[in-house]
Amino acid sequence: FPPWKDVNIQSEKANTPEAFALAQLPNISAWQKTTDMFGPIPYKKAGEPIMVVPYDSQEEVYNFFFEDLSAAIEVLTPKAEQNLKLLPNYDAVYRGDVVKWVKYANSLMLRMAMRIRFVDSAKAQMYAEKAINHTIGLMENKDDEAKMERGAGLVFVNNIETLANQYGESRMGSSMFSYLVGYEDPRIESYFTESESQYAVEVFNGRKYQAVPTGHVYAQNDTYKEFSMAKVEKTTPTYWMRASEVYFLRAEGALIGWNMKGSAEELYKRGVEMSFEENG
């Protein structure tokens, strides 16, 4: 939190609120994943110079998310409408492209809205439609994807590659194998490597794969050495969000009657098409 707090302080001193608004986006994105995994977290008072930081309920945390995200979008929108660049030499995600940052922010708002729709449908619909009706809009194209990779002085290594190749701890699971093979999904070649194991299964495309059966746990990682693993390299980007997810979120919203600027069927099909485009 100290670096994030420092950005806020320096942004206020320099009268550049857009710098802190930009910093809010990866901050909210990371904390959203954290609260979805662990529930209540210290958020509003996190980073304060106090001995005991109070936890906020997940409902409170999401309310803070929506407030902070809305404020950030409000600050960044005029910059996006002027097609200005912001901190391009320090931006490893969008190289300073504020239009894409605002599209990401709106898409993040849609994702968060969909996460709360079973507990507060009215609020979820309000924020989802707010995101889609924004003047800059949402992610719609492959180039809109938010991804971390080398750049802006960042030494980046894909963490899945580290888990799979360096630690030997990440391999294809049987559920994923079942879906991809059962639907004869050609993206399996983009997602996973072939297996040279004598137990590998030849599938519809003539290639062989081996997956870890659900519930099987072995003490030694070497047991899984020849199983199919994620097809990533050290330089493969880590994706925060892609346009295909946004289309699927819109399809879900349309399915329950929200105004998502398209029918559920149209948006779902576009999501599938976009996923194929994203994965070659």
Regions found by a protein language model. Give the residues of each.
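Structured, solvent-exposed acidic/aromatic patches
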Residues: 1-279
